[in-house]
Amino acid sequence: MKTTKGGKVMNPTDAYRKELRKKELKRNKKERKKVREVGILKKDPEQIREQIEKLEMMKADGALDKARKHKKRQLEDTLNLVLKKRKELQEKMKEKGETPVMFSHLGPPRRRTAEEEERAKHPKPEDSAYYHPTLNPTGAPPPGKPPMYLSSIGPRIPLSSDEASSSKTESDDVALPVPPPPPPLPDSGRLGSGDGSVIPASLPLPPPPPPPKPPTSAGANLGMSLPPPPLPPPPPGPPPKDLVAGQPPLPPSQPLQQSVQPPPPGMSGSEREGSLSALSDDSIFKASAQVPSTLPPPPPPPGMPQKSPNTESGGTASEADGNNLSTTTDLPKMVPPPPPPRQQPTVPGPGLMPSVPADVLPPGLSSFPPPPPPPPLDMRPPLSAPGIPGGANHPGMMVPLVPRPPYGPPPMMRPPLPPGPPPTLQEGEYAANRPTVPQKPSYVKSAAPTVVKRPLAQHTPELTAMVPASVRVRRETALPKAKPKPSVSTTVTTIQPATAPVVRQESIACSAAPKSQGKSIDDSYMAFLEDMKALGALDS
């Protein structure tokens, strides 16, 4: 426990702060002492001696006053202190094994002569810090560095003849290894030129291979654009279904044979192999393009038993589609895959919707009872419309199949999208019910609710603000005030003429009744509420 001088116990925080203050004072004292010592060490004892000598000469002449005597005494003390501190510093540095550094050996800053000024303004190559008699005679700085001159660093120290000769010999020795590299450079340039004669011959060689490869690379890229890896697996599954349906899988095999034939037309080794691989990919795409033509028939079986005639017609259409695919194989590759799924609904459509061709035309298909079908039905009318110009009957639906099969070369897209067509099958099943359903409900479904629940007029300040002050008076204070009655009727009659003359008559009758009966303000307020109700303000 620390106590003050009076014997009182100090607060621990105050005691701690007092200790910190003492430590800070000690630290400041040491710092001031160091600064003083450094200032003493920087002083030149010779200058102090010169000043003392001048004062002694003045003392001999008898012109030394009291102030100069005091100054002389201070100079003598500082001289003794400087010598003492220097001696201590030298001893400390010797103990540490370091050489003492004194600042007194540096004279006052010297101004440059006119010659040095001129030389600084117009430097010579020899003044450059990067100058070398043989390697860099111009003194140019290396790239990325600013020019540096010895004159800006300090005075040049002229080299003696021996040193100059030794430096020249050293520079020659250093220069000897450097010149050898330049000769090989021209040799390498010549070799490069010699190789250049071969390089031009080799340069034209690379270009020829690329031209034949672009088609293959383009085919490969096109193949990659229509996922090639997934395509092969689906076709093997459907072919058995096609066989069951009664259609032979010969078309895919024929394009494969044709694909085997193209490679020979003029390629060497690797090029032939690349072409074979690319053509095999193309053949796979062709086979996949023709397989879908046979794939459409399978969907009808799950739909209805009328698949047999429809499948035949689908087979004929598929053959025509296969011909179109063979003729236009490049177009389907560039066309986006989304269209193919829309073809499937059109394929089963002919067999399911021949009896109701007129239902396909109207855009009101979205009004069918099942909620899920409307979106696909909204999408269907535009698809069915193009076929109708060719023919109003279901054969017209087959017309879009001829141009659209090329859009669906990838069979991979068709298997996952059968879930989309089922709504169309259901629509075919409900074909008998379609004509009875009105088309207006579709608009009603899309319409937003018009009835909005509003608060009562008594609770809306916007409407109560319209009520006259005479009516808004409390019932307790309303009894003595019977004069405002005519004003209420007048205000009501004046406000209502612009709105509706019929309401004005009713309001006049209502206002006349209280006048004749001489009832209280409550009756007039009820009449006002009736007027407001007639205007539609109290509709809930």
Curated annotation (Swiss-Prot):
UniProt GO cellular component terms: nucleus; spliceosomal complex
Extent of the signal sequence: none
Superkingdom, taxonomy of origin: Eukaryota
Intervals of motif Nuclear localization signal 2: 71-78
Function summary: Involved in the regulation of flowering time. Plays an important role during the early flowering of precocious trifoliate orange.
InterPro entries according to UniProt: WW_dom-bd_prot_11 (IPR019007)
Compartmental location: Nucleus
Pfam families assigned to the protein according to its UniProt record, in alphabetical order: Wbp11
Residue ranges annotated as motif Nuclear localization signal 1: 16-23
Composition bias, Pro residues: 177-186, 203-215, 226-241, 294-304, 334-343, 368-379, 402-424
Keywords recorded for this protein, A-Z: Flowering, Nucleus
The species this protein was found in: Poncirus trifoliata (Hardy orange)
Known tissue expression: Moslty expressed in leaves and flowers, and, at lower levels, in flushes, roots and fruits. Present in rapidly proliferating tissues, such as shoot apical meristem, leaf primordium, and flower organ primordium.
Taxonomic path: Eukaryota, Viridiplantae, Streptophyta, Embryophyta, Tracheophyta
Record's compositionally biased regions (Basic and acidic residues): 112-129
Predominant location: nucleus
UniProt GO BP: flower development; regulation of photoperiodism, flowering; RNA processing
Record's protein name: Protein EARLY FLOWERING 5
Biased composition (Polar residues): 307-330
Residue ranges crossing the lipid bilayer per the database entry: none
Region (Disordered), start-end ranges: 90-429
